[in-house]
């Protein structure tokens, strides 16, 4: 008799995706981040659901409802901090996952990669709107500054901003709609993640060498299920260390002050995971130019497959490309640091140089290095 997991319509899907899936025998720990992102998403949806049971999306009560969650709701504080720091863990996993894709040439799976870029945009939008909900000073001013950027769009800009705000400033209508969008988007992300997985399973996983692994496949279960469980335990360990010992380490103290439209904080900055893009935005003196650079800093990922000039897929055997990749990582860390600094000398010039370097590395130096490496191999 055939096993039920291979015949039942629903279990068959699960079986083909997580149990009998043929996987390369040599995929490293860099391949753990996909499953970790899934765990992060489930965790965020669950903690978010329980927070939504006690949160009120009204300008007069939003801040105090978050205080109520932390003070009066049973284990409300841990749910709130797991949600806030869970977002940080989510983005750490996202950046590692994208970095892995860049390093090992996984972007040659075009559909999987493009759905991944859409997922990145959706996650960034969700995180931004979630940051507005506690209605602290940085929530309010962050929302005001970032939504205001759309006014740089010629002709329709001002109307677009007022349409998003639901009025002439960030107010009750804005908060309510941001809560609605923040609630629905994670489910859209979950659906997109399934599409992402669907496209991936059409081709099978890449591996560190970038060479086809059809000759040496192993079943996903038990080999990679146990490996994913180890990754999950480490993820939860780091998350709980953050939540229980330093819950406000990655947050902004200004967000413990209720939103006040009459008082602008001295330094408006987003959460740490947006700082690199914020630094690129600020490095251009022109408003529209800054907005375009901000969007392109993420959208550039779509161009990466077209810029792949190497005859090898992975960077495993390409030392020059490896050097450029790690310079890019250092450049992104520099941008993250600059994004959190005030707009003054020498931070302005460092930010501008790091922004130029970012686009130069991806658009020029990586393809050039690939061509040089091809010539070395007499290909």
From Swiss-Prot:
Keywords: Electron transport, Heme, Iron, Membrane, Metal-binding, Mitochondrion, Mitochondrion inner membrane, Respiratory chain, Transmembrane, Transmembrane helix, Transport, Ubiquinone. Heme b b562 binds at residues 83, 182. GO terms for cellular component: mitochondrial inner membrane; respiratory chain complex III. It is a multi-pass membrane protein. The keyword Heme applies. SUPFAM superfamilies: a domain/subunit of cytochrome bc1 complex (Ubiquinol-cytochrome c reductase), Transmembrane di-heme cytochromes. One of its GO terms (molecular function) is metal ion binding. It is found in: Mitochondrion inner membrane. Heme b b566 binds at residues 97, 196. Its cofactor is heme b. GO terms for biological process: mitochondrial electron transport, ubiquinol to cytochrome c. The chain crosses the membrane at residues 33-53, 77-98, 113-133, 178-198, 226-246, 288-308, 320-340, 347-367. InterPro entries: Cyt_b/b6_C, Cyt_b/b6_C_sf, Cyt_b/b6_N, Cytb/b6-like_sf, Cytochrome_b, Cytochrome_b_C_euk/bac, Cytochrome_b_N_euk/bac, Di-haem_cyt_TM. Pfam families: Cytochrom_B_C, Cytochrome_B. A ubiquinone binds at residue 201. Component of the ubiquinol-cytochrome c reductase complex (complex III or cytochrome b-c1 complex) that is part of the mitochondrial respiratory chain. The b-c1 complex mediates electron transfer from ubiquinol to cytochrome c. Contributes to the generation of a proton gradient across the mitochondrial membrane that is then used for ATP synthesis. PANTHER family: CYTOCHROME B. Belongs to the cytochrome b family. The cytochrome bc1 complex contains 11 subunits: 3 respiratory subunits (MT-CYB, CYC1 and UQCRFS1), 2 core proteins (UQCRC1 and UQCRC2) and 6 low-molecular weight proteins (UQCRH/QCR6, UQCRB/QCR7, UQCRQ/QCR8, UQCR10/QCR9, UQCR11/QCR10 and a cleavage product of UQCRFS1). This cytochrome bc1 complex then forms a dimer. This is Cytochrome b. The gene is MT-CYB.
């Amino acid at each position: 008799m055939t096993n039920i997991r291979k015949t039942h319509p629903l279990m068959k899907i699960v079986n083909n995706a997580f149990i009998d899936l043929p996987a390369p025998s040599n995929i490293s720990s860099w391949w753990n981040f996909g499953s970790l992102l899934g765990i992060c998403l489930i965790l965020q949806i669950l903690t978010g659901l329980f927070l939504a049971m006690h949160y009120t999306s009204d300008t007069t009560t939003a801040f105090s409802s978050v205080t109520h969650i932390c003070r009066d709701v049973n284990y409300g504080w841990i749910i709130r901090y797991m949600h806030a720091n869970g977002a940080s863990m989510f983005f750490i996993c996202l950046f590692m996952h994208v970095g892995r894709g860049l390093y090992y040439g996984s972007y040659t799976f075009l559909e999987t990669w493009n759905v991944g870029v859409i997922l990145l945009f959706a996650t960034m939008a969700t995180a931004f709107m979630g940051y507005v909900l506690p209605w602290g000073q940085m929530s309010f001013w962050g929302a005001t500054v970032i939504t205001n950027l759309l006014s740089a769009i010629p002709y329709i800009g001002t109307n677009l901003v007022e349409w998003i705000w639901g009025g002439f400033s960030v107010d009750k209508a804005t908060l309510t709609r941001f809560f609605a969008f923040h609630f629905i988007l994670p489910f859209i992300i979950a659906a997109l993640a399934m599409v992402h997985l669907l496209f991936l399973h059409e081709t099978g996983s890449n591996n560190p060498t970038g060479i086809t692994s059809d000759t040496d496949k192993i079943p996903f279960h038990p080999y990679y299920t146990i490996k994913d469980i180890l990754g999950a335990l480490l993820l939860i360990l780091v998350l709980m260390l953050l939540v229980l010992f330093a819950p406000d380490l990655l947050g902004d103290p200004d967000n413990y002050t209720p939103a006040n439209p009459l008082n602008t904080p001295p330094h408006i900055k987003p959460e740490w995971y947006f700082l690199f893009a914020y630094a690129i935005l600020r490095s251009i003196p022109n408003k529209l130019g800054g907005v375009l650079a901000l969007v392109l800093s993420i959208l550039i990922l779509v161009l990466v497959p077209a810029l792949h000039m190497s005859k090898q897929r992975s960077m495993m055997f390409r030392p020059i490309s490896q050097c450029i990749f790690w310079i890019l990582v250092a450049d992104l860390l520099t941008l993250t640091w600059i994004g959190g600094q005030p707009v003054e000398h020498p931070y302005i010039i460092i930010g501008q140089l790091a922004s130029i370097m970012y686009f130069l590395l991806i658009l020029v130096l990586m393809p050039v290095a690939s061509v040089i490496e091809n010539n070395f191999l007499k290909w």
